[in-house]
């Protein structure tokens, strides 16, 4: 376990330089979605934080609890190498938006990064690319790192439209960010989310390479090379190593398998470090 908070618990903006100088780092984020009570979260973190598996400085680990658990989780991980993420944010800083949470509110309680446009937000709550662009910008302006989630449906994939869909999501979703912004990308094919289907590593590599090329065209080659691109979609320990071996895969966005500390640690342990 890390004990030096100042060295190992720096906020994401500081990582921009670190990522630029050490591109081999891998990110593993666990999205709890709408799961866990306070008691369940405390039980999870008690066993999770104490694991020696988290002592590898080349693997950046994050948990993404529901809003109700963010404060408690922040207190629990504050002296650990674990970073804290939120599942979404509103694009406005404040206002009459009953039930919403803003980026300044999240930053104020110690959130480091925030998911933008997770497939469930896009397809269940009908969040559109222009709004997601505003949310990503709000995260940046509040001092957090946006994790822009992109992906195609099964119908879009089978029709050969994957790259067109991703290009549109990237072009609009990143359009409000400053030229030198630090952000993370997560490719999560909709047809693999919660279905048990995992994309073949060859397909994942091809898609991630396309995304990196697109980032280079939208920003610069330098930003493209240092931007982490994660894969998400029914990730389990059996698949973690083969996926992380892909040259353009810089980590994993884990869903259901992150609800068990044992399963999540197994995935982290399997991630390959170049």
From Swiss-Prot:
Its main location: cytoplasm. Pathway: Carbohydrate biosynthesis; gluconeogenesis; Carbohydrate degradation; glycolysis; D-glyceraldehyde 3-phosphate from glycerone phosphate: step 1/1. It is found in: Cytoplasm. It holds the Pfam family TIM. The keyword Isomerase applies. It comes from the Bacteria. The active site is at residues 118, 188. Its EC number is 5.3.1.1. Homodimer. Involved in the gluconeogenesis. Catalyzes stereospecifically the conversion of dihydroxyacetone phosphate (DHAP) to D-glyceraldehyde-3-phosphate (G3P). Belongs to the triosephosphate isomerase family. This is Triosephosphate isomerase. It comes from Chlamydia trachomatis serovar A (strain ATCC VR-571B / DSM 19440 / HAR-13). The gene is tpiA.
């Amino acid at each position: 376990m890390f004990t030096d908070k100042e060295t190992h618990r720096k906020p994401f903006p500081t990582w921009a330089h670190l990522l630029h100088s050490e591109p081999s780092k891998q990110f593993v984020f666990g999205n709890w979605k709408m799961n866990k009570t306070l008691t369940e979260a405390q039980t999870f973190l008690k066993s999770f934080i104490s694991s020696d598996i988290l002592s590898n400085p080349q693997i950046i680990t994050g948990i993404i609890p529901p809003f109700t658990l963010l404060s408690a989780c922040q207190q629990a991980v504050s002296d650990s190498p674990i970073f804290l993420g939120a599942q979404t944010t509103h694009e406005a800083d404040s206002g009459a938006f009953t039930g919403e949470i803003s980026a300044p509110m999240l930053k104020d309680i110690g959130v480091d990064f925030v998911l933008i446009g997770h497939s469930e937000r896009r397809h269940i709550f009908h969040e559109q690319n222009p709004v997601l662009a505003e949310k990503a910008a709000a995260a940046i302006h509040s001092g957090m790192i946006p994790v822009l989630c992109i992906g195609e449906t099964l119908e879009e994939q089978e029709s050969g439209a994957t790259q067109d869909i991703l290009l549109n999501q990237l072009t609009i979703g990143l359009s409000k960010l400053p030229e030198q912004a630090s952000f993370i990308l997560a490719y999560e094919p909709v047809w693999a989310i919660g279905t048990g289907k995992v994309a073949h590593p060859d397909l994942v590599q091809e898609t991630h390479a396309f995304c990196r090329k697109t980032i280079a065209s939208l920003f610069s080659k330098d930003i493209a090379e240092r931007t982490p691109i994660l894969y998400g979609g029914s990730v389990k320990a059996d698949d973690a190593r083969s996926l992380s071996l892909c040259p353009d895969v810089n980590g994993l966005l884990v869903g259901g398998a992150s609800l068990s500390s044992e399963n999540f640690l197994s995935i982290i342990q399997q991630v390959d470090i170049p």
